[in-house]
């Protein structure tokens, strides 16, 4: 079934929509959630919440890229669950990925946090547009999908060391760009 047909099922409020969505994009959403939470039960619960979130979001939304839409909802829910401390077991992959980016991101703080988060997201998106396909792939798989570095390297067809060095250079470029734009002080 095509994404457009699945979206049409959501607009018709057909319960078949969730089954078709899970069949087509469930593995991608599960991978995102599992990489963040690390626990099978938490992953299953978060996926159930994801399907409900998509059900509530379509309509009114009609996403152009359904898999990205689903993975974004899944990632946001998994991140909230992770930070709320409800994950019973954490394997540290998500913490490690966030620690790698710590020098590139402004400190959280106070009233400005919400505004600076939007500004930061826009700056990172502009930065990603400047990267080569390979560097953007590495960055997104490591920091958006929270994939382990050996997995990202294998997916990119390069050695662990090469991937690690390239990601380090990308983080340095990101830090420089954020400093230049005044997002990181």
Enumerate the predicted regions with their spans:
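DNA-recognition helix of helix-turn-helix
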Residues: 65, 79, 124, 135, ...
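Acidic, proline/glycine-rich intrinsically disordered inter-domain spacer in sigma factors
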Residues: 100-129
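Pre-recognition alpha-helix immediately N-terminal to the DNA-recognition helix
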Residues: 16-17, 28, 123-126, 133-137
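Structural recognition of an alpha-helix C-terminal capping motif at a helix-to-coil junction
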Residues: 45-52, 56, 64-76
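A short, charge-rich alpha-helical start-of-domain segment used by transcription regulators
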Residues: 7-31
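Short helix-capping/turn signature of helix-turn-helix
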Residues: 24-26, 36, 140-148
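Arg/Lys-rich amphipathic alpha helix in sigma70-family domain 2
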Residues: 72-94, 117, 180
């Amino acid at each position: 079934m095509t994404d457009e047909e699945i979206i049409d099922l959501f607009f018709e409020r057909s319960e078949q929509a969730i089954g078709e969505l899970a069949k087509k994009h469930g593995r991608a959403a599960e991978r995102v959630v599992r990489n963040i939470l690390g626990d099978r039960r938490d992953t299953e619960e978060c996926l159930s919440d994801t399907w409900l979130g998509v059900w509530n979001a379509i309509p009114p939304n009609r996403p152009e890229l359904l898999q990205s839409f689903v993975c974004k909802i899944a990632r946001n829910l998994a991140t909230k669950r992770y930070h709320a401390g409800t994950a019973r077991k954490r394997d540290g992959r998500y913490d490690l990925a966030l620690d790698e980016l710590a020098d590139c991101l402004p400190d959280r703080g106070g009233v400005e946090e919400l505004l600076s988060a939007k500004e930061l997201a826009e700056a990172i998106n502009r930065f990603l547009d400047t990267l080569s396909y390979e560097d953007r792939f590495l960055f997104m798989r490591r920091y958006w999908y929270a994939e382990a570095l050996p997995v990202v390297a294998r997916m990119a067809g390069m050695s662990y060391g090469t991937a690690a060095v390239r990601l380090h250079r990308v983080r340095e470029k990101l830090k420089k760009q954020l400093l230049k734009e005044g997002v990181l002080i």
